[in-house]
Amino acid sequence: SIYDDENMKLYLPGGQADTAKLYNSLAKMFEYYTKCDEVEQAKVQSGELKKPKLRKKLAKTLATVRPQLTNAGSDAYNAGNYANALKFFGLYVDAPQNPLFADEDAVKNDTLTPLIANYAALAANSLKDNAAVIKYATIGKEHKEEGYRSLMCLAEAYGKGETPDSAKW
């Protein structure tokens, strides 16, 4: 796969990986594998399949590469590409709620999720995307050391008067 080819280059002496290609293929993997799981689950629901055949394998594969999303998000954020940063951090933070990972304890119980949610909130804040700020900062504010960043983003989002009910946070 494109992901495997570029990822291998990261670990070879003198290897130059095309990180844009690597990270974009990573996002596509999440998109396609999730869609594949949805289609398979629909076939199970309709009785066309007795039980899912791919879910475990898809979940394991994505759980293995999921930490790379933080690198992708960090690189994008540091380059000032907040839209991509939000995409990658968002994929990371959204994973525990994805039914595909229902049996993946490492994903469901990931203690880094609130920290990464802070970064997603910061990227969303830079984009003035208040809906995403509220979505991710609500998770990020639970992080003991970095939660204040999400609270600041929430204060800014709610302070703009778009959501008058500030008691939510």
Predicted regions and their residues:
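Short loop/turn segments at strand-loop or loop-helix junctions that form parts
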Residues: 1-2, 153
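Short coil/linker segments at helix-helix boundaries
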Residues: 2-119, 131, 160-169
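TPR/Sel1-like alpha-solenoid repeat signature
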Residues: 76, 117-124, 136, 151-158
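Short connector loops at secondary-structure junctions
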Residues: 108, 149-152
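Short helix-capping/linker turns of helical repeat alpha-solenoids
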Residues: 112, 146-148
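A broadly tuned preference for mixed-charge, low-complexity surface segments
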Residues: 133-139
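Solenoid-like repeat scaffolds
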Residues: 140-144
